[in-house]
Protein backbone atom coordinates (compact mmCIF):
# COMPACT_ATOMS: atom_id res chain seq x y z
CA UNK A 1 0.00 0.00 0.00
CA UNK A 2 2.21 2.79 -1.22
CA UNK A 3 3.09 5.17 -4.00
CA UNK A 4 5.07 2.36 -5.65
CA UNK A 5 4.46 0.71 -9.01
CA UNK A 6 3.50 -2.89 -9.42
CA UNK A 7 4.96 -4.91 -12.22
CA UNK A 8 3.91 -3.70 -15.65
CA UNK A 9 2.13 -0.55 -14.46
CA UNK A 10 2.44 2.80 -16.15
CA UNK A 11 2.91 6.12 -14.36
CA UNK A 12 -0.04 7.09 -12.20
CA UNK A 13 -1.23 9.87 -9.93
CA UNK A 14 0.26 9.58 -6.41
CA UNK A 15 -2.01 8.02 -3.80
CA UNK A 16 -1.96 11.16 -1.69
CA UNK A 17 -3.20 13.22 -4.60
CA UNK A 18 -5.96 10.68 -5.29
CA UNK A 19 -7.14 10.96 -1.68
CA UNK A 20 -6.97 14.74 -1.69
CA UNK A 21 -8.65 15.23 -5.06
CA UNK A 22 -11.46 12.89 -4.02
CA UNK A 23 -12.08 15.07 -0.97
CA UNK A 24 -11.17 12.24 1.41
CA UNK A 25 -8.41 14.24 3.11
CA UNK A 26 -7.49 17.90 3.23
CA UNK A 27 -4.21 19.41 2.09
CA UNK A 28 -3.21 19.83 5.74
CA UNK A 29 -4.00 16.19 6.49
CA UNK A 30 -1.99 15.12 3.46
CA UNK A 31 1.02 17.04 4.77
CA UNK A 32 0.57 15.48 8.22
CA UNK A 33 0.29 12.00 6.72
CA UNK A 34 3.37 12.49 4.53
CA UNK A 35 5.35 13.68 7.56
CA UNK A 36 4.17 10.71 9.63
CA UNK A 37 4.94 8.24 6.83
CA UNK A 38 8.48 9.61 6.59
CA UNK A 39 9.00 9.65 10.37
CA UNK A 40 7.66 6.12 10.82
CA UNK A 41 9.10 4.73 7.56
CA UNK A 42 5.76 3.32 6.43
CA UNK A 43 3.74 3.68 3.20
CA UNK A 44 1.49 6.72 2.99
CA UNK A 45 -1.69 4.64 3.02
CA UNK A 46 -0.78 3.06 6.35
CA UNK A 47 -0.06 6.46 7.86
CA UNK A 48 -3.39 7.87 6.65
CA UNK A 49 -5.24 4.94 8.20
CA UNK A 50 -3.31 5.05 11.48
CA UNK A 51 -4.00 8.78 11.85
CA UNK A 52 -7.70 8.12 11.40
CA UNK A 53 -8.10 10.48 8.44
CA UNK A 54 -10.10 8.02 6.31
CA UNK A 55 -12.00 4.78 6.74
CA UNK A 56 -10.44 1.54 5.46
CA UNK A 57 -13.08 1.23 2.73
CA UNK A 58 -12.39 4.77 1.49
CA UNK A 59 -8.64 4.26 1.53
CA UNK A 60 -8.67 0.96 -0.33
CA UNK A 61 -11.14 2.33 -2.85
CA UNK A 62 -8.70 5.16 -3.53
CA UNK A 63 -5.82 2.69 -3.67
CA UNK A 64 -7.68 0.71 -6.32
CA UNK A 65 -8.07 3.86 -8.43
CA UNK A 66 -4.41 4.68 -7.84
CA UNK A 67 -3.32 1.24 -9.07
CA UNK A 68 -5.94 1.01 -11.84
CA UNK A 69 -7.33 -2.17 -10.28
CA UNK A 70 -10.93 -3.11 -9.42
CA UNK A 71 -12.11 -2.61 -5.85
CA UNK A 72 -14.16 -5.39 -4.25
CA UNK A 73 -16.21 -5.08 -1.07
CA UNK A 74 -16.35 -8.73 -0.04
CA UNK A 75 -19.30 -8.05 2.24
CA UNK A 76 -21.36 -6.96 -0.76
CA UNK A 77 -19.71 -9.29 -3.28
CA UNK A 78 -18.86 -12.49 -1.40
CA UNK A 79 -16.09 -14.66 -2.83
CA UNK A 80 -16.77 -17.96 -4.54
CA UNK A 81 -16.04 -20.30 -1.63
CA UNK A 82 -15.43 -23.19 -4.03
CA UNK A 83 -12.13 -21.54 -4.94
CA UNK A 84 -10.68 -21.79 -1.44
CA UNK A 85 -8.20 -24.61 -0.85
CA UNK A 86 -7.15 -25.76 2.61
CA UNK A 87 -3.60 -26.41 1.39
CA UNK A 88 -3.36 -22.72 0.40
CA UNK A 89 -4.32 -21.36 3.84
CA UNK A 90 -0.71 -20.50 4.71
CA UNK A 91 -0.45 -18.58 1.44
CA UNK A 92 -3.71 -16.69 2.05
CA UNK A 93 -2.43 -15.63 5.47
CA UNK A 94 1.10 -14.71 4.39
CA UNK A 95 -0.04 -12.78 1.31
CA UNK A 96 -3.23 -11.38 2.89
CA UNK A 97 -4.98 -12.42 -0.31
CA UNK A 98 -8.10 -14.48 -1.01
CA UNK A 99 -9.58 -15.91 -4.23
CA UNK A 100 -12.69 -14.01 -5.32
CA UNK A 101 -13.79 -15.41 -8.67
CA UNK A 102 -12.65 -16.76 -11.99
CA UNK A 103 -12.70 -14.69 -15.14
CA UNK A 104 -12.33 -17.35 -17.78
CA UNK A 105 -9.20 -19.25 -16.80
CA UNK A 106 -7.83 -16.39 -14.71
CA UNK A 107 -8.08 -16.46 -10.92
CA UNK A 108 -8.84 -13.08 -9.33
CA UNK A 109 -7.19 -12.54 -5.95
CA UNK A 110 -8.40 -9.78 -3.62
CA UNK A 111 -5.73 -8.20 -1.43
CA UNK A 112 -4.97 -4.88 0.28
CA UNK A 113 -1.38 -5.03 -1.03
CA UNK A 114 -0.85 -6.61 -4.47
CA UNK A 115 2.88 -5.90 -4.38
CA UNK A 116 3.29 -7.97 -1.21
CA UNK A 117 0.98 -10.70 -2.52
CA UNK A 118 2.99 -10.99 -5.75
CA UNK A 119 6.21 -11.21 -3.75
CA UNK A 120 4.79 -13.96 -1.50
CA UNK A 121 3.63 -15.94 -4.55
CA UNK A 122 7.10 -15.74 -6.11
CA UNK A 123 8.81 -16.72 -2.84
CA UNK A 124 6.52 -19.69 -2.23
CA UNK A 125 6.95 -20.97 -5.78
CA UNK A 126 10.72 -20.70 -5.44
CA UNK A 127 10.52 -22.80 -2.27
CA UNK A 128 8.15 -25.33 -3.81
CA UNK A 129 5.29 -24.36 -1.48
CA UNK A 130 1.59 -24.22 -2.34
CA UNK A 131 0.59 -21.07 -4.24
CA UNK A 132 -2.04 -20.06 -6.84
CA UNK A 133 -1.68 -21.11 -10.45
CA UNK A 134 0.16 -18.98 -12.99
CA UNK A 135 -2.85 -17.22 -14.51
CA UNK A 136 -4.06 -14.74 -11.88
CA UNK A 137 -4.84 -11.07 -11.44
CA UNK A 138 -5.39 -8.77 -8.48
CA UNK A 139 -8.26 -6.74 -7.11
CA UNK A 140 -8.13 -4.48 -4.07
CA UNK A 141 -10.09 -5.08 -0.88
CA UNK A 142 -9.85 -4.01 2.75
CA UNK A 143 -7.39 -5.91 4.90
CA UNK A 144 -9.89 -6.72 7.64
CA UNK A 145 -12.27 -8.16 5.07
CA UNK A 146 -9.55 -10.62 4.07
CA UNK A 147 -8.97 -11.65 7.69
CA UNK A 148 -12.66 -12.05 8.50
CA UNK A 149 -13.21 -14.07 5.33
CA UNK A 150 -10.39 -16.44 6.25
CA UNK A 151 -11.74 -16.84 9.78
CA UNK A 152 -15.18 -17.75 8.46
CA UNK A 153 -13.95 -20.01 5.68
CA UNK A 154 -11.34 -21.92 7.71
CA UNK A 155 -12.89 -21.84 11.18
CA UNK A 156 -12.37 -25.57 11.81
CA UNK A 157 -8.75 -25.59 10.60
CA UNK A 158 -7.83 -22.48 12.58
CA UNK A 159 -9.40 -23.89 15.74
CA UNK A 160 -7.54 -27.16 15.28
CA UNK A 161 -4.23 -25.36 14.85
CA UNK A 162 -4.81 -23.23 17.95
CA UNK A 163 -5.66 -26.22 20.10
CA UNK A 164 -3.46 -29.04 18.86
CA UNK A 165 -0.47 -27.78 16.85
CA UNK A 166 1.95 -27.94 19.79
CA UNK A 167 0.80 -31.43 20.77
CA UNK A 168 1.16 -32.65 17.19
CA UNK A 169 4.56 -31.08 16.51
CA UNK A 170 6.26 -31.10 19.93
CA UNK A 171 4.24 -33.36 22.24
CA UNK A 172 7.00 -33.27 24.86
CA UNK A 173 6.14 -29.60 25.50
CA UNK A 174 2.36 -30.09 25.53
CA UNK A 175 0.28 -30.69 28.66
CA UNK A 176 -2.58 -32.20 26.66
CA UNK A 177 -1.56 -35.77 27.40
CA UNK A 178 -0.78 -35.14 31.06
CA UNK A 179 2.30 -36.78 32.56
CA UNK A 180 4.66 -38.66 30.29
CA UNK A 181 5.34 -42.32 31.19
CA UNK A 182 8.73 -41.35 32.63
CA UNK A 183 7.20 -38.57 34.74
CA UNK A 184 4.46 -40.88 35.93
CA UNK A 185 7.04 -43.49 36.92
CA UNK A 186 9.08 -40.94 38.89
CA UNK A 187 6.05 -39.64 40.80
CA UNK A 188 4.88 -43.21 41.39
CA UNK A 189 8.25 -44.23 42.84
CA UNK A 190 8.31 -41.16 45.10
CA UNK A 191 4.76 -41.80 46.33
CA UNK A 192 5.54 -45.46 46.97
CA UNK A 193 8.75 -44.60 48.83
CA UNK A 194 6.93 -42.10 51.06
CA UNK A 195 4.15 -44.61 51.75
CA UNK A 196 6.61 -47.36 52.68
CA UNK A 197 8.60 -44.91 54.79
CA UNK A 198 5.51 -43.80 56.72
CA UNK A 199 4.67 -47.42 57.45
CA UNK A 200 8.21 -48.55 58.34
CA UNK A 201 9.79 -45.46 59.95
CA UNK A 202 7.31 -42.58 60.30
CA UNK A 203 9.64 -40.35 62.33
CA UNK A 204 12.55 -40.60 59.94
CA UNK A 205 10.22 -40.17 56.95
CA UNK A 206 8.80 -36.97 58.45
CA UNK A 207 12.32 -35.58 58.92
CA UNK A 208 13.29 -36.42 55.32
CA UNK A 209 10.10 -34.93 53.85
CA UNK A 210 10.45 -31.74 55.93
CA UNK A 211 14.10 -31.42 54.92
CA UNK A 212 13.28 -31.75 51.22
CA UNK A 213 10.47 -29.19 51.51
CA UNK A 214 12.75 -26.87 53.46
CA UNK A 215 15.41 -27.03 50.76
CA UNK A 216 12.74 -26.35 48.16
CA UNK A 217 11.58 -23.17 49.90
CA UNK A 218 15.18 -22.15 50.63
CA UNK A 219 15.86 -22.25 46.90
CA UNK A 220 13.00 -19.80 46.37
CA UNK A 221 14.42 -17.46 49.03
CA UNK A 222 17.83 -17.57 47.36
CA UNK A 223 16.24 -16.84 43.99
CA UNK A 224 14.40 -13.83 45.43
CA UNK A 225 17.60 -12.61 47.06
CA UNK A 226 19.50 -12.82 43.77
CA UNK A 227 16.63 -11.09 41.97
CA UNK A 228 17.02 -7.89 44.03
CA UNK A 229 20.38 -6.74 42.60
CA UNK A 230 19.41 -8.02 39.16
CA UNK A 231 16.18 -6.03 39.35
CA UNK A 232 18.00 -2.88 40.45
CA UNK A 233 20.40 -3.24 37.52
CA UNK A 234 17.47 -3.75 35.16
CA UNK A 235 15.77 -0.65 36.55
CA UNK A 236 18.87 1.40 35.83
CA UNK A 237 18.90 -0.06 32.32
CA UNK A 238 15.24 0.87 31.80
CA UNK A 239 16.03 4.47 32.69
CA UNK A 240 18.38 4.81 29.72
CA UNK A 241 15.67 6.32 27.55
CA UNK A 242 18.26 7.91 25.28
CA UNK A 243 19.03 4.42 23.98
CA UNK A 244 15.51 3.90 22.64
CA UNK A 245 15.24 3.25 18.88
CA UNK A 246 14.03 5.95 16.53
CA UNK A 247 10.49 5.55 15.20
CA UNK A 248 11.65 4.74 11.67
CA UNK A 249 13.76 1.85 13.01
CA UNK A 250 10.99 0.22 15.05
CA UNK A 251 9.40 -3.05 13.86
CA UNK A 252 5.71 -3.88 13.73
CA UNK A 253 4.60 -4.91 17.23
CA UNK A 254 1.65 -7.24 17.80
CA UNK A 255 -0.36 -6.81 21.01
CA UNK A 256 -2.63 -9.69 22.01
CA UNK A 257 -5.37 -8.91 24.54
CA UNK A 258 -7.54 -11.93 25.38
CA UNK A 259 -10.88 -10.91 26.91
CA UNK A 260 -13.85 -12.82 28.24
CA UNK A 261 -16.88 -11.17 29.84
CA UNK A 262 -14.84 -8.03 30.56
CA UNK A 263 -16.92 -5.36 28.86
CA UNK A 264 -16.70 -3.03 31.85
CA UNK A 265 -12.91 -2.68 31.67
CA UNK A 266 -12.68 -2.18 27.91
CA UNK A 267 -12.81 1.66 28.06
CA UNK A 268 -9.88 1.68 30.51
CA UNK A 269 -7.98 -0.75 28.30
CA UNK A 270 -8.60 1.39 25.21
CA UNK A 271 -7.19 4.45 27.00
CA UNK A 272 -4.11 2.50 28.12
CA UNK A 273 -3.46 1.32 24.56
CA UNK A 274 -3.83 4.87 23.21
CA UNK A 275 -1.16 6.07 25.65
CA UNK A 276 1.47 3.75 24.17
CA UNK A 277 4.39 5.72 22.72
CA UNK A 278 4.80 3.77 19.49
CA UNK A 279 4.17 4.60 15.82
CA UNK A 280 0.47 3.94 15.26
CA UNK A 281 1.06 2.43 11.82
CA UNK A 282 3.40 -0.14 13.38
CA UNK A 283 0.92 -1.36 15.99
CA UNK A 284 -0.99 -4.57 15.36
CA UNK A 285 -3.43 -4.74 18.29
CA UNK A 286 -5.78 -7.69 18.50
CA UNK A 287 -8.64 -7.76 20.99
CA UNK A 288 -9.39 -11.47 21.25
CA UNK A 289 -13.04 -12.13 22.09
CA UNK A 290 -15.10 -15.29 22.36
CA UNK A 291 -17.61 -15.28 19.52
CA UNK A 292 -20.52 -15.77 21.94
CA UNK A 293 -19.42 -13.04 24.39
CA UNK A 294 -22.00 -10.57 23.11
CA UNK A 295 -21.61 -7.93 25.81
CA UNK A 296 -17.85 -7.53 25.32
CA UNK A 297 -18.21 -7.54 21.54
CA UNK A 298 -20.93 -4.87 21.72
CA UNK A 299 -18.79 -2.68 23.99
CA UNK A 300 -15.76 -3.05 21.70
CA UNK A 301 -17.83 -1.92 18.71
CA UNK A 302 -19.22 1.07 20.64
CA UNK A 303 -15.77 2.40 21.54
CA UNK A 304 -14.88 3.49 18.00
CA UNK A 305 -11.50 1.79 18.14
CA UNK A 306 -8.70 2.84 15.83
CA UNK A 307 -8.03 1.05 12.56
CA UNK A 308 -4.92 -0.63 13.97
CA UNK A 309 -7.10 -2.40 16.57
CA UNK A 310 -8.71 -5.59 15.27
CA UNK A 311 -11.42 -7.71 16.83
CA UNK A 312 -10.57 -11.41 16.59
CA UNK A 313 -13.61 -13.57 17.35
CA UNK A 314 -12.68 -17.03 18.60
CA UNK A 315 -15.29 -19.71 17.80
CA UNK A 316 -16.51 -21.54 20.92
CA UNK A 317 -14.52 -24.70 21.59
CA UNK A 318 -12.80 -26.45 24.45
CA UNK A 319 -10.68 -25.57 26.26
CA UNK A 320 -12.08 -22.05 26.74
CA UNK A 321 -8.84 -20.57 27.98
CA UNK A 322 -6.89 -17.41 27.25
CA UNK A 323 -3.82 -19.36 26.05
CA UNK A 324 -5.96 -21.06 23.39
CA UNK A 325 -7.46 -17.69 22.43
CA UNK A 326 -3.96 -16.22 22.05
CA UNK A 327 -2.91 -19.20 19.92
CA UNK A 328 -5.90 -18.56 17.66
CA UNK A 329 -5.12 -14.86 17.20
CA UNK A 330 -1.40 -15.48 16.83
CA UNK A 331 -2.14 -17.06 13.45
CA UNK A 332 -2.97 -13.55 12.17
CA UNK A 333 -0.17 -11.65 13.90
CA UNK A 334 1.87 -9.34 11.67
CA UNK A 335 4.48 -8.18 14.18
CA UNK A 336 8.14 -9.07 14.55
CA UNK A 337 7.51 -8.95 18.30
CA UNK A 338 4.49 -10.02 20.34
CA UNK A 339 3.28 -8.92 23.77
CA UNK A 340 0.29 -10.18 25.75
CA UNK A 341 -1.70 -7.75 27.89
CA UNK A 342 -4.55 -8.57 30.22
CA UNK A 343 -7.69 -6.44 30.31
CA UNK A 344 -6.67 -4.68 33.55
CA UNK A 345 -3.07 -3.98 32.53
CA UNK A 346 -1.80 -0.40 32.37
CA UNK A 347 1.57 -0.64 30.59
CA UNK A 348 3.90 2.32 30.76
CA UNK A 349 3.82 4.32 27.50
CA UNK A 350 7.38 3.48 26.41
CA UNK A 351 7.27 -0.20 27.33
CA UNK A 352 7.26 -1.49 23.75
CA UNK A 353 10.18 0.71 22.71
CA UNK A 354 12.16 -0.42 25.74
CA UNK A 355 11.42 -4.06 24.94
CA UNK A 356 12.69 -3.60 21.37
CA UNK A 357 15.85 -1.95 22.72
CA UNK A 358 16.46 -4.72 25.26
CA UNK A 359 15.94 -7.46 22.69
CA UNK A 360 18.44 -5.68 20.42
CA UNK A 361 21.02 -5.59 23.23
CA UNK A 362 20.33 -9.16 24.38
CA UNK A 363 21.70 -12.28 22.79
CA UNK A 364 19.73 -14.66 20.56
CA UNK A 365 19.09 -16.93 23.56
CA UNK A 366 16.68 -14.33 25.01
CA UNK A 367 13.18 -14.96 23.67
CA UNK A 368 10.95 -13.44 26.35
CA UNK A 369 10.97 -10.42 28.67
CA UNK A 370 8.87 -9.75 31.77
CA UNK A 371 7.69 -6.18 32.28
CA UNK A 372 5.68 -4.41 34.99
CA UNK A 373 2.02 -3.89 34.17
Q: What does each model-identified segment do?
A:
Residues 124-164:
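Extended, hydrophilic extramembrane loops/domains of integral membrane proteins
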Residues 48, 109, 225-232, 314, ...:
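Active-site cores of enzymes that catalyze phosphoryl transfer or operate on phosphate-rich substrates
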Residues 46-131:
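Polyanionic, low-complexity intrinsically disordered segments
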Residues 13, 39-42, 91-94, 102-105, ...:
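Short flexible coil/turn linkers enriched for glycine and charged/polar residues
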Residues 236-373:
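Internal catalytic domains of large membrane-associated glycosyltransferases
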Residues 1-42, 49-72:
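An alpha-helical, amphipathic repeat domain used for nucleic-acid recognition
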Residues 88-90, 150-158, 324-331:
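Short, surface-exposed amphipathic charged segments that create phosphate/polyanion-binding patches used
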Residues 158-247:
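N-terminal membrane-anchoring/stem segments of glycan-assembly enzymes
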Amino acid sequence: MADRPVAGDTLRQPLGAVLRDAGLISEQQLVQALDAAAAWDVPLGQAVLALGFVSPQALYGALARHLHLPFIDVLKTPPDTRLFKAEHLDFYQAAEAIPIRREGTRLVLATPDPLMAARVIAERRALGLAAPEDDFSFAITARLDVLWTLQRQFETVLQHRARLTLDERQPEFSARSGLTPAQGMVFGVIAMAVLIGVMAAPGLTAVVVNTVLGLFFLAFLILRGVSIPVGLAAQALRQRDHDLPEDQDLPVYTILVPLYQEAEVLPLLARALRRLDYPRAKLDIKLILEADDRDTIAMAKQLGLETYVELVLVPPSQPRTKPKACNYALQFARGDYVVIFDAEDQPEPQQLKKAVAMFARAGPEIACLQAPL
